[in-house]
UniProtKB/Swiss-Prot annotation:
Key words, A-Z: Cytoplasm, FAD, Flavoprotein, NAD, tRNA processing
Protein name stated in the entry: tRNA uridine 5-carboxymethylaminomethyl modification enzyme MnmG
Example GO biological process: tRNA methylation
Encoding gene, per UniProt annotation: mnmG
Xref: Gene3D superfamilies: FAD/NAD(P)-binding domain, GidA associated domain, C-terminal subdomain, tRNA uridine 5-carboxymethylaminomethyl modification enzyme MnmG/GidA
Organism of provenance: Chlamydia trachomatis serovar A (strain ATCC VR-571B / DSM 19440 / HAR-13)
Amino acid sequence: MWTFPVDYDVIVIGAGHAGCEAAYCAAKMGASVLLLTSNLDTVAKLSCNPAVGGIGKGHIVREIDALGGIMAEITDLSGIQFRILNQTKGPAVRAPRAQVDKQLYHIHMKRLLEQVPGLHIMQGTAEALLDNGEKVLGVSTKEGWAYLGKTVVLSSGTFMRGLIHIGTQNFSGGRLGDAASLGLSEDLKRLGFPLGRLKTGTPARLLASSIDFSVMEEQPGDHNVCFVHRNEMFVPTLPQVSCHITHTTDQTKDLITKNLHRSALYGGRIEGVGPRYCPSIEDKIVKFADKDRHHIFIEPEGLNTQEVYVNGLSTSMPFDVQYDIIRSVSGLENAIITRPAYAIEYDYVHGNVIFPSLESKLIEGLFLCGQINGTTGYEEAAAQGLIAGVNAVNKVLRHPPFVPSRQESYIGVMLDDLTTQVLDEPYRMFTSRAEHRLLLRQDNAGMRLSHYGHSLGLLSSERYAMFQEQKACIEQEKERLSKTFRKYGDTVVPLTKVLCRPEVSYQQLLTEFPADVRDLGPVVGASLEMEIKYSGYISRQQTLIRSMERSENISIPEDIDYHSISALSLEAREKLSKFTPRTIGSAARISGISVADIQVLMVSLKKDAH
């Protein structure tokens, strides 16, 4: 087998959202990087919905931007509708979401990656890992040659032994129209990796000209919403479009109920578990039998195509049943299908063999990111890609790994969850997964994480200075307003007390007291308002974190023998040996580990220290 005459620092397998972020970040840190993809025309392809962000997910994209990644930038360039979700709810759960042009997203990402120094993008299909039994050495390809690298990042998406289901029909594929990867699964098994099966699905695509939008509710976008942190107002570069909302009918329910046995999911042909919070339409009908109808969202796939995505109508039914189901939906009576819905099963690796840095515990220098780790979603994948790419370079440079904590980021929450919990379904980020979500708002991601991005060499000095200036402005203005007393109603109070009132906004305060309130602009002003309005809650959460950190970050030796600690419960010995947590905090979050077990472990660590 011929070996390519370059020894790379980092080889990234797969150019989906995880792979693109990993390759970009590794190259930006100065590494020589190979990004290997089976098809250059599908780089950063949005395989399912044409959207980025949402609750929890939008927070992650903002964190990626704060660290110096690229998903936010590509989303803003490709966005054809921007919205803030949960506007009427508290600031912790408000999140940006964008409809994007699928083709432009791919084009912008590929063009950007092609311009990064040190990054070589190559078409080829990874067939097997090269290793010496302890350390990864590179990758061999289906085409018959090999690439050598000091580290390898595996971001295979749904391609590992991917199996597509449409009713009773099933066939191999990584997604509809693309071949599955068969060799990598076998190779990981050879190396001792425990594999499981998960399932996801995607709805049919329809021709917009065949849809009756007049009976649907129009859903326009919002103004000044974006993913890249800015000081100024954001004006989209592309024309903006609306989505539309419709619903299923009694006929839809009857059709699905009568044909349930023909569904790949309910017919017993799918062994993988699907995402709980993105169920197929047949799953909704069965699990929510008391509901007469379900919302369906019609989302445009781009500006230069008539295809639309039917959000909420994912299914693994046969095509003839899909046809009838779609035409039973209000406004879709004459809909023309351009692509069928399907479900897909794929292999993933259990989290107990992965460090929070996303390096494998079994083969040194091998990093895993994206759906191979059991997650679902472009955003979760991209965040893991950033972490894997950064830590692959840290490995080469012999620097300590970068692992943000769950107290300071949603990315940290995800890394901790993936490596301490047993997944029984695809992992999706929600704000409810974070214990301190009021501290992890989407508006303050830059102030929380930009110092990491700058120190890693991913975030420019100019952007870092912007974040530092924002942070300083907010702190200074909070201090000044707390010492500025004015009459409000019948009493004289500091202006911070006025802004704490639920009916008073920062803009109202600025209008009412123009001589006393500094105009920080709408972006920084909104963050200032949240910091002041929720200062009591924020202070309590910060106090709680400080008290927890004393035990949270106590290190556990890598060579500890849990089976020798007889006071631990049998379940604790088994679980701790399986997951090998690095800190007491991580150990405490493993399912089945009790407070008593943690106390025993801490006593044992103190004895060993003495």
